UniProtKB/Swiss-Prot annotation:
Transmembrane segment boundaries: none
The protein's name in its UniProt record: Large ribosomal subunit protein bL36B
Pfam families documented for this protein: Ribosomal_L36
UniProt keyword Ribosomal protein present: yes
Membership in a protein family: Belongs to the bacterial ribosomal protein bL36 family.
GO terms (BP aspect): translation
Entry GO MF terms: structural constituent of ribosome
Signal peptide: none
Organism: Methylobacillus flagellatus (strain ATCC 51484 / DSM 6875 / VKM B-1610 / KT)
GO CC term (a single one): ribosome
Length: 41
């Protein structure tokens, strides 16, 4: 999982990528290609 300052590029990397909020942090999850997971500080 990458830790990024901006998730704008992360959510456009794959068409299945979704932005979700968990525990006050913002995550990008990708079911079909999990190597595109990312988190914002």
């Amino acid at each position: 999982m990458k830790i990024l300052s901006s998730l704008k590029s992360a959510k456009t990397r794959h068409r299945d990528c979704k932005v979700v909020r968990r525990h006050g942090k913002i995550f990008v999850i990708c079911k079909s290609n999990p190597r595109f997971k990312a988190r914002q500080r």
